[in-house]
UniProtKB/Swiss-Prot annotation:
PROSITE patterns: RIBOSOMAL_L36. Belongs to the bacterial ribosomal protein bL36 family. GO terms for molecular function: structural constituent of ribosome. This is Large ribosomal subunit protein bL36A.
């Protein structure tokens, strides 16, 4: 899980979602998981 000021989709499988008011990227590839904060 990377915590970054701006989250971006890295590949085609990445999805940007909102969870508990946080913007997150979820993906099949665990290296692509990101959270904004």
């Amino acid at each position: 899980m990377k915590v970054q000021p701006s989250v971006k989709q890295i590949c085609d499988k990445c999805k940007v979602i909102r969870r508990n008011g946080r913007v997150m990227v979820i993906c099949e590839n665990p290296r692509h998981k990101q959270r904004q904060g």
